[in-house]
A protein has these predicted regions:
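Short, well-formed alpha-helical segments that are part of the catalytic scaffolds
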Residues: 1-16
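Acidic helix N-cap motif at the loop->helix transition within catalytic regions
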Residues: 2-6, 34-43
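Residue-level signature of catalytic and energy-coupling elements of molecular machines
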Residues: 11, 62, 80, 149, ...
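Short loop->beta transition adjacent to catalytic acidic/histidine clusters or analogous donor-positioning motifs
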Residues: 12-26, 35, 45
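Acceptor/aglycone-binding surface of glycosyltransferases and processive sugar-polymer synthases
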Residues: 48-66, 73, 85-163, 189-200, ...
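Short beta-strand-to-loop acidic/aromatic patch adjacent to the donor-nucleotide binding site
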Residues: 70-82
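Catalytic donor-sugar/metal-binding loop of nucleotide-sugar-dependent glycosyltransferases
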Residues: 136-137, 158-161, 171-187
């Protein structure tokens, strides 16, 4: 709730329209108890009310809606004030044909108060583990700022429920030959309390990377 209005106001809608994009802003609400839904609706956003709990469940529901609507490209960013929506055009400019692009915080403008040393070290270790296990280069595994072509989303095979979703998107790209590009981005201190728990969620992400090395395809997409 705290960052939504500011983030919406900074989306470069006019610049995107001038480039030929027809835009829509979609908010996936994971059962929030604050004013997120009412603020989103007042701003003119489309709201998806998430079924089930967890970031992964919400993202997969958003992907499904995207494919039903029939749009061509999708930009995803966490709505916590850490990512700069002004940089959406930079991601779209670098989007490979039939691929995805990941905003790279670790080689971009990472503000000094934006990430704890524990999270920075954990992200580096998880990113190293991802490449060691799956071979495809990636520089910021846990980034929450991605852009996707429609073809890439159609090919992703996912069943993650929580914060391991980005890791599974990466492994699916690695095993299905989906092109990945990387763009350095700005990363600022978040608004509000973080939901990502360093140890618990880091362990879940590592487990997902290992499982997808042994079983590249989910047994069941929930």
């Amino acid at each position: 709730e705290g960052a939504l209005q500011d983030i919406y106001s900074r989306i470069p809608i006019e610049k995107l329209k001038n480039r030929g994009y027809s835009t829509r802003v979609v908010v996936v609400d994971g059962g929030s108890s604050d004013n997120t839904v009412s603020i989103a609706e007042e701003l003119g956003c489309e709201v998806i009310r998430q079924r089930g709990e967890g970031k992964g469940a919400g993202m997969r529901q958003g992907f499904k809606k995207f494919l039903e609507i029939g749009d061509d490209e999708l930009v995803m960013l966490d709505c916590d004030g850490t990512y700069h929506p002004e940089e959406i055009t930079r991601l779209l400019d670098s989007l490979p044909e039939n691929g995805i692009v990941i905003g790279d915080r670790l080689h971009g403008n990472l503000h000094s108060d934006a990430m704890t040393s524990t999270n920075w070290i954990g992200n580096q270790l998880l990113t190293w583990l991802a490449v060691a296990l799956h071979g495809k280069p990636i520089y910021d595994l846990c980034s929450g700022f991605w852009a996707f072509s429609r073809n890439a989303i159609e090919r992703l095979q996912l069943n993650s429920m929580r914060f391991e979703i980005e890791a599974e998107m990466y492994t699916s790209c690695a095993h299905r030959g989906i092109p990945i590009a990387h763009v350095p981005i700005t990363y600022s201190k978040r608004v509000g309390e973080a939901k990502l728990g360093s140890i618990k969620d880091g362990t879940s992400i590592a487990r997902k990377l290992i499982i997808r090395r042994i079983f590249p395809t989910p047994h069941e997409e929930r």
